[in-house]
Amino acid sequence: MIPVKGVAGQNVAVLGLGRSGLSAARALREGGAEAICWDDNPAARATAEAEGFTCRELTKQGAFDGISALIVSPGIAHLYPKPNPVIRAALVAGVPVDNDIGLFFRSVATSEWDEFDTAPKVIAVTGSNGKSTTVALLHHILEHVGRNSQMAGNIGRGVLDIDPPVDGGVVVLELSSYQTDLARALTPDVAVFTNLTPDHLDRHAGMGGYFAAKRRLFAEGGPDRAVIGVDEDEGLFLAGQLSEGESDDRVIRISARQKLSGGAGWTVFARKGFLSEYRKGRQAGSIDLRDIPGLPGAHNHQNACAAYAAARTLGLAPRVIEAAMRTYPGLPHRSQRIAEADGVSYVNDSKATNVDSAAKALSAFKNIRWICGGLEKEGGLEALKGATDDVLKAYVIGREAAQFAMQLDVEAEVCTTMAQAVSRAMAEAGPGETVLLAPAAASFDQYDSFEKRGEDFIAEVTARLNG
């Protein structure tokens, strides 16, 4: 655990008692504060009270008297589309609002670091798609070479639940826009921006606010090194804002769509399955990504570029990084090949919760029986047009399956449930084809999470193959 600094003797309110909220409450208590907790869910309050925390309704008059700060869980709206009443009450009372990420960055460094031979590093990864894979791949690379590494944030453990970093240790964080938007301190040693596509627009009042939330990771003087995906205009702009000129190698530009100029400082790009690194005009490394089983498709090649670049900032050699990549097993629910039978492959990409990530998943396979649908996100399905050339047929799930199906430019069958979609896709699939779950939508109309949706897909496929 990382005890929170500077809160001894204070009363600090905590809103939201899920994983990050309870983690923050524990770390505040470890730092000498009294955590005053609230969650609208009685079961969540009961869990907190069982750990000895005080729960108190925070919208009542005077609720913030004597409270020094409010710590908010990432799933709770703090501004758009409308502030949560507790957050608004705190702001009216003049109480600072923060989250566990802000607490982490102000508390992780200790006086013990002065005695270390090599100060620990914090690498933070943000972006619309590929964050989890980039973080998991980088963590795997570090473990493969024997570096002490912990991953946390939007993946793995809560940031305050990790062990205090050791001499030479590395903490790899996945940070969502919800987390970067609210954190009062964001000071990583290396910051990574993978890409930007429309997502969570209701929480950020549009693309401008969404980009601004991501961009905050690179403010406050900026990280020592920045790895920036430049395949979208926002990333290209961000790299330009951070760079002092063509020879500035504090910024590493990465791409999975284009060959980057070797003269532009430090670049890493993937073309036709080959990763190339150029530094100050000379090639410094290359990897053939095509036969790495844990990284299928061009979208994973972008993730490979990001993890490779971050690893290089730590001084790891290209050949060592390549050896580690070849043993990377991949993440569940992200281009996860779950079975192959009678020449048909079954792939679970339930994490493809928006149209951009679904389009990238579709580009990685041929002859696709596509299971899609769910809670459609703002922006519609327009971006999928042109990405479905290899789709033989779509099998649409979700409460609004009929409306979803009407927007597709391929033959589509309304199935509604996962069981029906899997049954129909398996019945019609033949050798050389792939049954792919890539929903292009959120899961919350039918499932608690994308993980539950992916697990349902796996269970349906497995039951039929074993039946």
From Swiss-Prot:
It catalyses: UDP-N-acetyl-alpha-D-muramoyl-L-alanine + D-glutamate + ATP = UDP-N-acetyl-alpha-D-muramoyl-L-alanyl-D-glutamate + ADP + phosphate + H(+). SUPFAM superfamilies: MurCD N-terminal domain, MurD-like peptide ligases, catalytic domain, MurD-like peptide ligases, peptide-binding domain. GO terms for molecular function: ATP binding; UDP-N-acetylmuramoylalanine-D-glutamate ligase activity. InterPro entries: Mur-like_cat_sf, Mur_ligase_C, Mur_ligase_C_dom_sf, Mur_ligase_cen, MurD. Its EC number is 6.3.2.9. Keywords: ATP-binding, Cell cycle, Cell division, Cell shape, Cell wall biogenesis/degradation, Cytoplasm, Ligase, Nucleotide-binding, Peptidoglycan synthesis. Pfam families: Mur_ligase_C, Mur_ligase_M. The keyword Iron does not apply. The keyword Cell division applies. ATP binds at G127, S128, N129, G130, K131, S132, T133. GO terms for biological process: cell division; cell wall organization; peptidoglycan biosynthetic process; regulation of cell shape. Belongs to the MurCDEF family. Cell wall formation. Catalyzes the addition of glutamate to the nucleotide precursor UDP-N-acetylmuramoyl-L-alanine (UMA). This is UDP-N-acetylmuramoylalanine--D-glutamate ligase. The lineage of its organism: Bacteria, Pseudomonadati, Pseudomonadota, Alphaproteobacteria, Rhodobacterales.
